[in-house]
């Protein structure tokens, strides 16, 4: 999965997919009542990027729905996965469940079209703080109470705080999550980060008792780092330059081993090295 980073304006969906992304990452900020409000990152952000592009969250979802609904004039067949980077640090811990409930309602109405031919992309809810695990339970409860438990098949989870792998595993247990797990590792492109924890995450993914289905590394803009991440066995790379990742995947060393994921590739299925 080539994951376009910080896609917060509807116009950027086309831009990133046309550069080679089959997945996008979108920031979601919340208001004081735990309603998802804007797709907005703010300052500071990655080096070389404009930090302030935004939409109202529900409007972004409508644009995203068009981009992922077959037959729509804005449809992109290859856009198959969306990571919502949930900026929950503005919330109190006890608001996490409410945030999950409200997120589910927004997605149900504006993205999944109340279960009636909505957008088809898989969704990953990426949470920066292990203490906010009740966001997941609130999200699932709401899809069930609103009559659409089947949409949980389209949703997965990620804790993005670079926590100890063992602590993340314990948190999923508390949240009742037994699958659909992506594990991120990374840092802003302005700084360097080694691949030690990525390798641990990949080892956990490939073990018989690991909780991880997929591992992705962020934010990668250089060819050399892309090669290092691929050599470490990641499933996804988040980038500001999807064309760079696509170029490396075309190199003879990687062409035989990797391909770009399509809609038929289940993002919740573990593919071991």
From Swiss-Prot:
Membrane-spanning ranges: none
Enzyme Commission number, as recorded: 4.6.1.-
Disulfide cysteine pairs (residue numbers): 45-51, 47-190
Function: Dermonecrotic toxins cleave the phosphodiester linkage between the phosphate and headgroup of certain phospholipids (sphingolipid and lysolipid substrates), forming an alcohol (often choline) and a cyclic phosphate. This toxin acts on sphingomyelin (SM). It may also act on ceramide phosphoethanolamine (CPE), lysophosphatidylcholine (LPC) and lysophosphatidylethanolamine (LPE), but not on lysophosphatidylserine (LPS), and lysophosphatidylglycerol (LPG). It acts by transphosphatidylation, releasing exclusively cyclic phosphate products as second products.
Gene3D superfamilies: Phosphatidylinositol (PI) phosphodiesterase (3.20.20.190)
Ranges in coiled-coil conformation: none
Record Pfam families: GDPD_2
One GO cellular component, as annotated: extracellular region
The protein, known as: Dermonecrotic toxin LdSicTox-alphaIB1ai
Cofactor note: Binds 1 Mg(2+) ion per subunit.
Species of provenance: Loxosceles deserta
Keywords: Cytolysis, Dermonecrotic toxin, Disulfide bond, Glycoprotein, Hemolysis, Lipid degradation, Lipid metabolism, Lyase, Magnesium, Metal-binding, Secreted, Toxin
